[in-house]
């Protein structure tokens, strides 16, 4: 039984692949070796290739797609250039605005500094004027240990119309004429006192 099956298998012919269709193979081979010109003239394509209507439509669609891709690429490049130009213009404008803000800030600081300096000067002038207004002047006409001598000089000065006073400090009795708002008034009184004695102008 086993020998019969083996003989039957040997009797069957080996499997042979069918021959490839000659017509289809020739068409594919022709397409593989054929140079396909792609230009803008469908008539040229038809003349050189002798394509079927379906193949011609495919090639025309490829050309259209390529044109559309080129146009899209050109538009993208143009848009990129415009964006770069706008960005550069905005950057330049921002720099100008920043410089203007800096100049404005420096100007404001300078004005504030000038105002502060002016206020300081005014305050200094007021202080000087206040010091001048608060300072009094007088005459020192003599200093005596003897009270009677001081009173004698006081009386003679009063006779000239001066407000002579005696100020006692320890053992000294000082005869002074006071007080005057300005140094000029004290100098005038000094001239009047010369008929009695020499006095010196002092601050009080």
Curated annotation (Swiss-Prot):
Residues 1-20, 70-99 are annotated as: Disordered. To E.coli FtsN repeat regions. GO terms for molecular function: peptidoglycan binding. This is Uncharacterized protein HI_0896. It comes from the Bacteria. PANTHER family: CELL DIVISION PROTEIN DEDD-RELATED (PTHR38687), CELL DIVISION PROTEIN FTSN (PTHR38687:SF2). It comes from Haemophilus influenzae (strain ATCC 51907 / DSM 11121 / KW20 / Rd). InterPro entries: Cell_div_SPOR-domain, SPOR-like_dom, SPOR-like_sf. Residues 1-10 have a biased composition (Polar residues). Residues 131-204 form the SPOR domain.
């Amino acid at each position: 039984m086993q020998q019969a099956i083996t003989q039957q298998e040997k009797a069957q012919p080996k499997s042979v692949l069918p021959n490839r269709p000659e017509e289809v193979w020739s068409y594919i081979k022709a397409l593989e070796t054929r140079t396909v010109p792609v230009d803008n003239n469908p008539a040229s394509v038809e003349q050189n290739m002798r394509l079927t209507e379906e193949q011609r439509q495919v090639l025309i669609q490829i050309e259209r797609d390529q044109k559309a891709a080129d146009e899209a690429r050109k538009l993208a490049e143009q848009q990129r250039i415009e964006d770069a130009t706008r960005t550069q213009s905005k950057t330049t404008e921002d720099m100008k605005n920043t410089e203007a803000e800096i100049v404005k800030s420096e100007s404001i600081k300078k004005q504030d500094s000038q105002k502060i300096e002016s206020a300081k000067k005014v305050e200094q002038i007021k202080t000087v004027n206040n010091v001048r207004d608060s300072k009094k002047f007088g005459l020192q006409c003599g200093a005596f240990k003897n009270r009677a001598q001081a009173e004698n000089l006081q009386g003679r000065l009063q006779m000239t119309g001066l407000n002579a006073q005696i100020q006692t400090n320890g053992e000294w009795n000082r005869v002074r004429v006071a007080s005057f708002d300005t140094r000029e008034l004290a100098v005038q009184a000094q001239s009047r006192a010369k008929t009695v004695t020499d006095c010196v102008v002092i601050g009080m």
